[in-house]
Structures are given as C-alpha cells and as structure tokens.
From Swiss-Prot:
It is an enzyme of class 3 (hydrolase). Activated by Ca(2+). It comes from Trypanosoma cruzi (strain CL Brener). This is Metacaspase-3. It is found in: Cytoplasm; Nucleus. The gene is MCA3. Cysteine protease that cleaves specifically after arginine or lysine residues. In epimastigotes, may play a role in cell cycle G1/S transition. Its EC number is 3.4.22.-. Keywords: Calcium, Cytoplasm, Hydrolase, Metal-binding, Nucleus, Protease, Thiol protease.
Amino acid sequence: MGFDFGCLLKLCSTVLKPGGAPGPINYMEIGLNLIKIAAPYIVQYLGIMERPPRVDVEEFFQQAEVTEGFKPWEAPTHVSGTFRALFIGINYYCTSAELSGCCNDVKQIIATLQRKRIPIDEMSILVDERGFPGANGLPTRDNIVRYMAWLFGGAKPGDVLFMHYSGHGTHTRATSDTEEKFDQCLAPVDFSTKGCILDNDIFRILLSGLLQGVRLTVVFDCCHSGSMLDLPYTFVGSRSLRRSVAGHMQRIRKGNDCAGDVLMISGCADEQTSADVSNAATFGTGASGAGGAATQCLAYTILKVSNLSYQDMLIATRDMLRRKGFTQVPQLSASKPINLQQKFSLMTTFEVDPAVAT
C-alpha cells in the first residue's frame, strides 16, 4: 500500500508541537455537530502484517520528558492525583486503507467526557484530520509511542490515566508468545513505511512499570483488539448474557501481571473486525457522521445510563451493537479479577472478586 505523506500534510493543519490548546474548546458542541464527510459503512481488513521493528522504549521515555499536554476544561479536581488522557484517531487519508470515522470517534469520546465533567488535568490528541481543535500532532508511529510514554511517565499512586484509540488494528505472526499464534498490532498513519506497533511493546510502555494505586483505562476501537494489552483476566460470558445473570472474570494468561488497576475495553475479539458506521446519529449520542460502532455504543452507555456495573456496561454495549445488526462482540479485560458488580468508573480502583482464582 502506498503512503503519500505530502498528500496527508495538505489535509492536516496540525504538526507536532509541544502541546497547549489555543484557548478553551467546546468539545461538546463539536461532538454534537459532526458533519458527515466520510464514506459509507465499510469494514476494512489489513491482513497479516510483516513483523514490525521493536520499540526502543528508553529512547521514547526520554523524549516524553519534554512532551506536554493541555488542560481541556475546568471541572472539579480529582483530589487524589492527576488525570491524564491521550486520544488517537486515524483515517489514513490518501491511502487504500482509508477509514471514515476514526477522528469523529475522538471528538465523540472527548465530548462524552466533557459532558460528564470528567476532571482531565492534561490531555493530548493525535489525529490526521485537518483543523482538529487542540491536536498535538499526527498519529505517526514515533508520535504514538512518544505520547504513550508521556501518558505513563511519572504516574504515581492516585493518578488516573485514559487512552482511546480509533483506527486500524491488525496482527502479525507471533515469534515467542506460546499462548497465541499472533501478536496484535496498532497501525499508525505511516505503518506502510515505519511498521505497526506490537502489543508486546504497548505492554512494555503502558503497563510493565505501572505502580499500585494507579488507574488506567484503555479503549481500542479497532480490528483484532481483544487482547491488545495481553492482560491476564477477561470477562467470561456468552454474547447473549443477560444483566440478571452474574458473569465473572477468568485468568486466561500466565504472567503479564502488573501492580496497577488496568481496564481495557476493545471493539471486538482478536479474530473479529470492528465496524465503521456511516451515520453515527442512529446510536443516539447526538453525533452525526461516520464513527466507530463500539465508540458510539460506549459513549451512549456512559451518557444515557447511570450507576451501571462493569458487567452492565459491557452487556449494554454488546446489546446495542447486536440490535443494530453488528456481529462484533466488545471485550473487557483487566489486570486484576474485577468484581463485575462494582459500579463502572474511569477513576476508582478495583474491587477484586475473591471467588476468582489468581
């Protein structure tokens, strides 16, 4: 697949900069007034990719020390620590891998967090859409790794971290993972020339040194994302599981434990594709235009329903996708066996289910 960086730069008005928003930005208004500019609903599959080069993690942590985000809005402070967030949306303009709604997903999820008055202290945005308000740069391989290092860097007990990715996910043949035949990958905007980002490297950046008392939530709205973080515990329950039936977490992987409280919500299982819809307004979030099905369902669930448990949140998202005719099944995995009846939150640490074998 060819990649015309010149074409992309013509479409994008944002280049890499240290950070800082050009004044207050009303993301709620943006999220509620998305203009339909994209192609009809289509699922694209990149296929099995060549194994990418490994990431020099230490180099990017050094770069992250001089990387900054910005405070997007005023909200009651998260008193126990700092709330830091990273948003990545990639439409792959001017390539055969072009998608239509990934940057809209970023607008929608930010608008959702603003409407819920989530107290974000520092935020960074990587998108390839021209004129995206507050964007820090393009979602190149180097930038994504650098900003993931920024997100994690210096996190201490009481801090809250959030990351949302919407774009292509793919996989490559595993070389050392004895439990899986494939490693999952994120596809940056320049993946055809620079390579993808392995799940092993994402784990090394975000999770390997995470301290106890740090809360991290990661949302992947992309194909083959069910085990993108290689977390040890996952939600167990059939696609048709009802809210009245108690589900549970189960250890599916030995090793890859981390001290922090990590929740991953993915758009689909490893073997599935994640859909891009042409009319997000049908999901009732107030948005119009193209957007990822899983992102729209999650945003709707967070906005419209209060006091959901972790299990209820996942089942509500799955049910909405099923009613809309999608076959993908969103997944929930974690660093610890969460008590799934605990109230869903982006900020609190987990209650552990003592019945789950560790």
